[in-house]
């Protein structure tokens, strides 16, 4: 009897002390779950590393593209300086002074603007009004589905009408004070919108005294026009006397001493309207299409 009890106790002890407990059947082996878990963990870690590397490469690509796009052309001054100068009225007595010059074989009519304020207009104003001194086109447009669409950024009195940064040249206006420049940043457009100003974009011809060949999408020879700025910050409107390529026109502007220039379509007018500082008017403004205009007043 005592022997049988002792045998039973030993059997119970053996069962309790046995540290191998079969749970998953005969195929289960100690440590197999940990090994599979480690493999899965390594796979997830490798996938995360590859994903992070891909995101870094993709981010670097888009950052590089953004920097190249925004800084493709030289700048004669930063956007912050242009914004600051938009608070400064144009110097001099209100009026337009005309002279003819030649550079690189290109004959040009150069209209110097002084003491004037710029305004957007969608129709030709009465330029017999003594307050009107000069009129030119501003942005371009296309007709799509029977509707007029302005090309490039176009902001009028703080209202965004069109958005596109590809055309790197621009004219910005705040309270009549105008500045031209070359930049694809949205910084100036944001400032103009917040301050109820106006802005349009055009093809860049000259940026920081260098050509902007990637913007020269208009081929052939026709008479050309542009707004340009010199080192002193004075603003001019230039038109060629004879048909020229954009390359030849830009080279002539640089040779003459302009540091920035933006293109204006429409070509030369046979006898363009302008008003001298003494109030004497000349010529007339002709435009048979509904272009957006810049009107300069005192």
PLM region descriptions:
Residues 132-135, 169-170, 177-180, 203-204, ...:
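Structural motif
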Residues 11-164:
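Zymogen propeptides
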Residues 145-164, 217-221, 229, 234-260, ...:
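Conserved, well-ordered active-site substructure
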Residues 98, 225-228:
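Short, surface-exposed beta-strand/loop micro-motifs that present aromatic residues
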